[in-house]
């Protein structure tokens, strides 16, 4: 895509929105990218690394003893009063979708997730969802609906949570432990392996030094150097300058 000629905003990720890749942060400098690549290839990134999975986005909450879902920002308003109600509601919401694989992915995932969440105690559901003002963002990995990365397993990946006020505005949230906590609760009830999906949290990885380090780092840094050379840019320039 020629960003200069085709300057549209692409909205992805359902109600949550698109989670940017590193190269989409146009405020980064080229030397930042070089540093990230070197740290990744040498095993120098400290701690655990979260894999950015490539699936279909949905948000889930619980209100008035019912599992509810959000696919657009309007569903968050009034603490989920007008959200999609249960797996049946998801089936109706996607009922006229032209892609049967997408329809199946969301419908089956909603059924399995609904069953998993309803296995929790009332105290757990209240703690996790707060009766519709706290939502957990999930990603549906369904091999038939592959975007870019192919997968061999059917997974519901629980990510972070966000809290919303009555008007549907974000007022809080996290990026780390919430999905893992909810997945752990569901696993304790032995409902994490469902009819179609396994309910889990974001994969955590450790990156060791690559074996063919010299060749690999030369290839990656060579691509960045070629891009800088093409547009007459320096390591201290922001990568967004290559797109304007």
Would you name each region that the model predicts?
Residues 1-9:
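Short acidic, low-complexity intrinsically disordered linear motifs used
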Residues 9-47, 52-243:
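Core nucleotide-handling region used for phosphoryl-transfer chemistry
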Residues 3, 243-244:
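N-terminal secretion/transport leader regions
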């Amino acid at each position: 895509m020629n960003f200069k000629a085709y300057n549209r905003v692409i909205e992805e990720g359902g109600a949550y929105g698109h989670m940017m890749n590193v190269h989409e942060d146009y405020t980064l400098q080229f030397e930042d990218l070089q540093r990230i690549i070197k740290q990744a290839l040498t095993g120098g990134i400290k701690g655990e690394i979260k894999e950015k999975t490539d699936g279909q986005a949905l948000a889930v909450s619980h209100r008035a003893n019912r599992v509810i879902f959000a696919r657009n920002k309007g569903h968050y308003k009034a603490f989920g009063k007008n959200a999609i109600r249960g797996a049946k509601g998801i089936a109706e919401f996607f009922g006229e979708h032209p892609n049967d694989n997408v329809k199946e992915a969301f419908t089956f995932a909603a059924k399995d997730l609904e069953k998993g969440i309803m296995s929790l105690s009332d105290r757990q559901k209240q703690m996790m969802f707060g009766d519709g003002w706290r939502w957990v963002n999930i990603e549906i990995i369904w091999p038939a609906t592959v975007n870019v990365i192919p997968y061999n397993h059917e997974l519901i990946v629980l990510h972070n949570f966000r809290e919303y006020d009555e008007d549907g505005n974000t007022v809080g949230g996290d990026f780390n432990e919430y999905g893992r906590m909810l997945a752990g609760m569901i696993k304790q009830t032995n409902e994490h392996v469902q009819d179609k999906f396994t309910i889990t949290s974001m994969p955590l990885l450790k990156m060791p030094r690559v074996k063919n380090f010299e060749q690999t780092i030369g290839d990656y840094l060579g691509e960045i150097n070629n891009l800088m050379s093409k547009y007459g840019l320096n390591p201290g320039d922001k990568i967004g300058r290559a797109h304007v």
